[in-house]
């Protein structure tokens, strides 16, 4: 119990130094939002977070990004305890938006952890490799979701540390129900597209 108490105190102290930047997550509708929701609920005792994207139209999204940028500047100006900026991003517009937050954090002398979720990042990278690489190399650490992504980012960067942090899932709220009808029951929660791997999974099931 004493060790558990000490661990919780240390975790609270460390998490208080982190400022998280990412999409609207209170009512998660996507993978990144769900990860952030789980971080707040299950991982970080103190979850300092600024939302930099959300809304149903381009104007709302732009206003959310601008307000998030200003809020981040205020927080970094007034709170010297915030030492690490943890930015969740993906590809295309998400990465372009995150680039401004990376630059702002470095301008204030903070460490930057860029947590990349985008499955289309390889396709995105070839659209502007020089600029994208410059943003990545400004970061102190890049977080990827798998070994293959880690290997990929090692080939296009030359500065930041690269670490693997797999997405966490919430523990089940109810006991598992067992089915004994001889059938395979598969629940897929996500966008039905090639990048998510659902078609590969169905193909493997068909073959085996």
Where are these regions (language model features)?
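An aromatic- and histidine-rich active-site surface loop
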Residues: 68, 84-108
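N-terminal subdomain of nucleotide-sugar transferases
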Residues: 2-55, 109
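A short, histidine- and acid-enriched strand-loop-helix "catalytic/donor-clamping" loop
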Residues: 89-94, 110-127, 141
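Conserved donor-binding/catalytic core segment of Leloir-type glycosyltransferases
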Residues: 19-21, 178-207
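A short, basic/aromatic alpha-helical/loop segment that forms part
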Residues: 29, 95, 171-174, 193-198
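Nucleotide-sugar donor phosphate/pyrophosphate-binding loop at the beta->alpha transition
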Residues: 118-135, 171-173
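Donor nucleotide-sugar binding/catalytic pocket of nucleotide-sugar-dependent glycosyltransferases
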Residues: 137-174
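Nucleotide-sugar donor-binding and catalytic loop/hinge architecture
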Residues: 10-16, 172-185
